[in-house]
Amino acid sequence: MAKKNENTIEVKAINPRRVIVTIEGDSDLILNKMNDVSTRQLIDQRKDKAKDLTKPNEWEQVITAMHWLNGKPTEYSEESLVDALQNNAPCLTAFGLKKSFGQAVVRNEIDTYATKFDASVNVIGKGDGLVPIRFAEHHIDEKLMSPKKGSPVLVRLNRFSGWQADIEISFIENVYSQEQVINIINLAGFGLGIGSGRSSGYGRYHVIGVTSIVTE
């Protein structure tokens, strides 16, 4: 009986490094995702529901325009916002940060595509993929925005001064070194930024510290 050929495949363990990268804002950060009021209005339009003529709660618009580390508040008032800013934490998203890092790889011609970076570097968020920020001051800016259709609308933007964030990064060192990863993050912070209003120069940052995470 013929003996079968046996091929041995060596599977090498992946040992990613993990670090905490602390970034600090060079310009104010604006957090302004689609709020719950706008979401409801959009859904109603698509369902051809009659337009709700009641005045929207402006505090709901402000509060729900941000991701919150411990879940968004369920009451919408100035007091609720102050309490949330003190006892909860507004957040960036791990998805948004990693996307901007990948864009920096391509725009700075480190690689032609972000495919290799996306496969070898991860941004690890808390809970639902969130990265909380620390800040010195919070402001609400009122601004007239002109939609593609219809009249200008008044929007309220959450703007943070003196902000920082700790980002947990894992990466495969034989693909990108720690120095390269930090350089990419700095390039993203300088040229792209994070949050809303990036085209106007908001959300710029740089790395101020790197701490290794020791795993067993």
Give the positions of each predicted feature.
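RNA-interacting cores
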Residues: M1-E216
